[in-house]
Amino acid sequence: MRERQSSGPIVLLSGGVGGARMARGLAAVLPPAALTVVVNVGDDDEIYGLHISPDLDTVAYTLAGREGPPGWGVAGDTFAVMGHLGALGVDTNFRVGDADLAVNLARTAALRCGESLSAVTVRLAAALGLACRLLPATDDCLRTRVHTAAGEWLSFQDYFVLRGHRDEVAEVRYEGAGAARPAPGVLEAIAAASLVFVAPSNPPLSIWPILAVPGIRDAVTAAPRVIAVSPLFGGRALKGPADRVMAALGLPPGNAGVLAAYDGLLTDLVVDQDDAADVAALSRTAVRLHAADTRIAARDDAARLARYLLDLS
């Protein structure tokens, strides 16, 4: 596939699966040095004594062509360690494959030796053969916490993985965000970007944690063009709780809610072609709306959407 000559550097704000697929599409059509992916770390956690960075790893595995069939994990991974842990009486409800564990072991060892998360990420990305730049939003501890309607505060992993995001959400917080600093290179990449994309990730759970890091939202707002891709189709998420969480937090239904989630941030919003009626219905906003086929599970579809988005600029 021929590379598209971009008019300048590109930044993508990304969560997990949806963002990873959009990153894959952009990487397929851009020169490698043109793309920086800034990734959510709000769902980082400690599991089995290891520092896990699920969104960073999902993006890295997808860009490397090694993602598992659901869109996360490593394709063809084995689970021997999980079997051994289970035999020792360890709770293994949080399933991590052996190859995935190796990445988490390498990351944790480096962090404990004083290396920053961004430095570890750059090194692991190089080991996986990535050509574009992959950065965490922050090197500092920032954790998404979900307050359920039943009154419990849950870590993101407890809410999303162990409890299957079935709980009704009452509130979302980003612990540590106020004291967090953007990772080295993040603000510089955004300031240099001719175009910032917001991936079709869950706004409150994947993109808001990035924007909660002081300085990042202001940097994005100052960018000449900020284009988001809606994560909704007919008002619903294809998978995951984006629509339910947005509603629980008081955002309007459908793409009006996506606009509200990114109020004051966007120049453009791309909705799915099946929601083309929203282009006219929501045209009274200052944001330009566009309709396209935004289903990007397949590689070719992700590249097609990437070319469309770049042509908008």
Language model: regions and residue ranges:
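Active-site glycine-rich loop that binds ribose-phosphate moieties when present
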Residues: 170-189
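Extreme N-terminal starter segment of soluble prokaryotic enzymes
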Residues: 6-11
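Short Gly/Thr/Asp-enriched flexible loops that form oxyanion-binding sites at enzyme active sites
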Residues: 23-27, 206-219, 283
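C-terminal functional extensions of proteins
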Residues: 2, 239-313
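Short internal beta-strands
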Residues: 36-40, 225-232, 268-274
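A short helix->loop->beta-strand "cap" motif at the edges of active sites that frequently abuts
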Residues: 31-33, 222-226, 286-287
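Redox- and metal-dependent alpha/beta enzyme cores, enriched for Fe-S-associated oxidoreductases
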Residues: 210-249
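Electropositive, gly/pro-rich neighborhoods at or near active sites that engage anionic ligands
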Residues: 2-3, 39-175
